[in-house]
Amino acid sequence: MRDDGTLQSYRSLSNIERVEVVKGPAGALYGRGSAGGIINLVTKRANGDNFTNVNGSVGSNSQFVGQVDSSMAFSDKVNGRINLEHRQADSYVNHVDSNDFFIAPTIRVLPAEGHTVDLDVEYAHQELVPYRGVPSKNGKPVDVSESSFYGGTNDYQESDSLRVGINYEWRLNSEWVWTNRAAYNHIELEQKGTRQGTVTGDKVSQTVNNFGYDPRTTTTMQSELVWETDSNQMMIGADYNQINIDLTLASDKTLPPKHIYNPVVGATPDPGFKPFRDNTTTTTGIYLQDVYTLGDLSVIGNVRYDSMELEQQKAGKAQEKLDDNKVSYRGGLVYRINNDMSVYASLARSWQLPYSGIYINPKLAEFFHTDLKEVGAKAYLLDNALMLNAAIFQIDQEQPQTNINGDVINKIEARHQGIELEARGQITELWDISVGYSYLDAEDKDTGKKPNDVSDHLFSLWSTYQLYENWRLGGGVKYVGDRYAGNNEAVALGDYTTVDLMAAYTTGRHKVQANAYNVLGEKYILGATSGKSGTNQIGYGAPAEFMLSYGYQF
């Protein structure tokens, strides 16, 4: 899984129990991200089960994945679990490869009735060659092979990260639960990357941009108290988050231009890593949420207050500061039509730090805010085996621009509005399905142009069927509509459709599974970096690829 966009790395999912996509106005509760929703990763816990799962996979482009998930009970009050993963692969792109190692032990202690303590440790080492895609010409990506590489043969990225977390839950009684969390994350990273610049004729300019974290640390503390009765669910909480970044940066702009249709690659200069700036971002928040149910009607409300402070020290320059206090909110109604169907309406506002708070730009001295309005319906059919959901939404974001004195001189306003339809669950005991469709009308309100890399139509379908006792077959289709790279719809990325298939055979403790991705060999654009640079850093998606896996449970 790609990170949040600021770490420039990938996160292993080997110790993740499930990935929750929390759609809608979650921003006021969590205080981070957009009112459009968040992604929540739920880690595996040491719950006292005794098992060991071993999995190995081989696939296209010399891909190999090895995983171990082992759980044990040391005593009636202490449990342990450990997840390990090693990945290595070449790529469909020439000169691009990766090598990762991940280990995540966790211990659960039950010191007394109603008390649970979870201690987590995660360590990851990652080596990869950064891929910056292909340039564009005349409003389209250049038509070259997906394997084309425009970087330097000595480009690299190497990172080491360590995360330590503790979670303490105290069930005071049947109605009250008090949860406290603390986590510390430390990452050191170096990247040497050769990037495309501006296209002139059939040549594209290039620069080498080196950057690193030396280090980047994140400290998080959170406390929540939940009171739950038959008719009321109330949560009050507080959290503290601090990000410290020691950024190194250097560049070399002396590279000769490269031919866009026939890139000849070789080693590029390495300008090293020089101290550039130190940043500290501190956020302290308190929040309250309440859900009160009266008959078939539930009223939802929550409010959050944040105090945010940013400090920045660039090498050889005066210290810069940015601080503000903001209030986010959410309100909603849910009406239960019958035991199987409900309708709802909600509105929310949340605040975001420019550039996710990782640095200060004097021209963006005001925080962004996002407003969401949504109405929808949800139904559970076939004895709750199948969930249906429909929603109509509108998201407005305002990004104030300021002068060097912090005065607002302009506002960039964007609107995303559309519909979303979803069905997920079991049609029969043997047949699972997950299908979704979204229509999204997104535009810059001043220009009427689409934002970077936002599609108007999205459709996905995945279904599996249990064929006989041992066999399970599945397949899916994904469609992504027309998109553009860069501002003002500078480069048309087009639409695409991919088809994936799978087959699995299980007998006893053994499981063999085959996966085929993009089986029709669709040539498509996966995405582009945001802003002006995205017009010449456009990534092709993978052609047809295959994976064969074997798993055994002890």
For each of these PLM feature ranges, what is it?
Residues 52-54, 80-82, 117-119, 178-182, ...:
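Transmembrane beta-strands of outer-membrane beta-barrel proteins
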Residues 110-112, 216, 231-235, 239-242, ...:
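Structural signature of Gram-negative outer-membrane beta-barrels, strongest in the C-terminal barrel
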Residues 135-149, 199-206, 248-275, 320, ...:
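Surface-exposed loop/turn segments flanking beta-strands in extracellular/periplasmic regions
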Residues 162-187, 205-315:
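Face-selective signature of the C-terminal outer-membrane beta-barrel domain
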Residues 167-171, 177-193, 343-344, 367-442, ...:
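Membrane-embedded beta-barrel scaffold of Gram-negative outer-membrane proteins
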Residues 228, 296, 394-396, 410-488, ...:
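Gram-negative outer-membrane beta-barrel transporters
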